[in-house]
A protein has these predicted regions:
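Helix N-cap motif at beta-to-alpha junctions
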Residues: 46-51
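Short amphipathic alpha-helix segments
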Residues: 9-25
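Short glycine-/aliphatic-rich beta-strand segments at the starts of folded cytosolic domains
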Residues: 1-11
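Conserved short beta-strand edge segments in small beta-sheet-based binding/regulatory domains
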Residues: 32-33, 62-69
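A generic structural motif
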Residues: 40-44
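Short Gly/Ser/Thr- and Asp/Glu-enriched loop/turn motifs at secondary-structure junctions
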Residues: 35-39
Length: 69
């Protein structure tokens, strides 16, 4: 399963921190940010994960995160 999210994270350091946190929360998932894209893309790939968990982790820190349609 691959899910793509739109975020407002524009800082590389923050993106790295969130990637580490998401990998801990979602074992076995690959997490990658593309901050060059205008939507500040977050891509999560794994066999089983709940997209709402990704949104929760990001939004709990005050950032926006939504599934990109």
């Amino acid at each position: 399963m691959i899910e793509v999210f739109k975020t407002n994270i524009s800082n590389e350091k923050l993106a790295r921190q969130f990637a580490i946190q998401l990998r801990n929360e979602l074992p076995g998932c690959r997490v990658k940010f593309d901050l060059q894209d205008c939507d500040k893309i977050l891509k999560v790939e794994g066999s089983q994960f709940i997209p709402e968990k990704v949104i929760e982790v990001i939004s709990m820190s005050g950032f926006e995160c939504e599934v990109l349609e």
